[in-house]
Amino acid sequence: MQDKKRRAVSARAARAGVANELRIVGGEWRGRRVKLAAGAPIRPTPDRVRETLFNWLQPVIRGARCLDLFAGSGALGLEALSRGAREVVFVDRDARAIRQIAATLEALAAPSMPLHVSDALAFLRGAASPFDVVFLDPPFASGLLANASARLEDKGWLAAHALIYIESAHRDGPPVLPATWRLAKAKRAGEVGYYLVERRRRADEQAR
């Protein structure tokens, strides 16, 4: 009876267009299903977008240190771990989302990863340590993307040749980037624009 109830709930969610799980599309955990936090305002990156993104990142993701700054479902960070990332730091202000990511990591028998219940900008005011890859998928129309990008660049959060992935509303056009960032890839999936950005060393870094 409980199984029938669960299937009925899942069917209603599917008809309503509400996702209650996502699928890891590549790597060690390919095909594994991941539950989403109930009640949390989450917009997971679609399968086909993640597949394209990690094709872009394929040369660098193994052994990389990654930051999933607006983690939500954790889809991007989990995909990175599945494909060999050394570490992913997950940050989200919704405790339900972080608890679900913790449960997912445990279910996957993954190594322990840093999990932070925190506003993204508050997190970036802390002590910085450089990341090789950063995932930036803030809520659309929140105004957080520009501020987060500036803090990542100015406060020492990025390795010299870091890659930054950005998702934003396609209607807003390409994101405004710090001067040291260069747009390398750009694609669209429905109303979502998604971008891969390369960081170049600043002049003061090159002099060291």
Regions found by a protein language model. Name each.
Residues 1-208:
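Class I S-adenosyl-L-methionine-dependent methyltransferase catalytic core
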